[in-house]
Amino acid sequence: MADTERALADAIVGLLDQRADGATICPSEAARRVDPESWRDLMPDARAVAARLVDDGTVEMTQRGIVVDPATARGPVRLRRAGGGASAWGPG
């Protein structure tokens, strides 16, 4: 994992650690933490890192509160700690 990707992963996990159980963050919050000036340029990487964190079971990606597959999610997404609620694939 490249330094930027590691920093994004650390930022995602760190931001979630600061939030209440079940709370969500936007991937842009992690990108802003890593590079406040050029965070928009990091957004594709932030979503890719979030997808890897989903794959390893660390976080869930949601849209409108429902867990979604990062491979098919389009548009705004939120991230939360894994195990946080309803799933598009069945009971969460």
Q: Which sequence ranges carry the predicted segments?
A:
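Short, low-complexity, intrinsically disordered N-terminal peptides in bacterial proteins
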Residues: 1-7, 83-92
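Short acidic, hydrophobic short linear motifs in intrinsically disordered regions
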Residues: 22-33
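Short, cationic-aromatic polyanion-contact patches
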Residues: 65-90
